[in-house]
Amino acid sequence: KVNTVTEQYDVAQAKLVMGFRVGASSMEEMQHARLMCLLFGGTPRSKLFMNVREKLSLCYYCSSRLDRNKGIMYVNSGVEHENVEQAKEEILHQLEQIKSGSFTDEELNETKLMAVDSLRVVNDSASSMEGWYLSQMFLHSQASPEEEAEQLLKITRDQIIAAANRVTLDTIYLLSGEDK
């Protein structure tokens, strides 16, 4: 059962947040979920950005992020009130596209490179390194950014598809200015 929460507030555009459980049972599966989340909505070339925002113009912004500590993926979007239902449907459709393997090797490789590039800059500042190793501690991992990048590059198409197929919608939150 999907939990649905709607709140009313005087806002110009609706705020739609969809929470998904990633169903990862190991650190390795969480790595797969991390890359899948980036492919889904974590980069400027992601499914959500390219399709929901750019191609269909359903959202002012639309992105996904993974909370690895909780095993939850969030999709955040700003939507015109009249586009909320269509945006929800399209977000779920884009996830189904990944579940069915409807993404190119080029998209996967670009996502991997963007992930690796973001890991390369961790060592550029003491505060970034501190944040990295603190988050690793909470994950019960001792992987360096370099080791993490190496692991991400080895993730296969089939592992991304499997990660997507473990994802289940848990909660839909809508902050809307219109009384529906």
Q: Residue ranges of each PLM-predicted region?
A:
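Mature, solvent-exposed C-terminal subdomains and processed small-chain segments of exported/organellar
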Residues: 1-74, 78-180
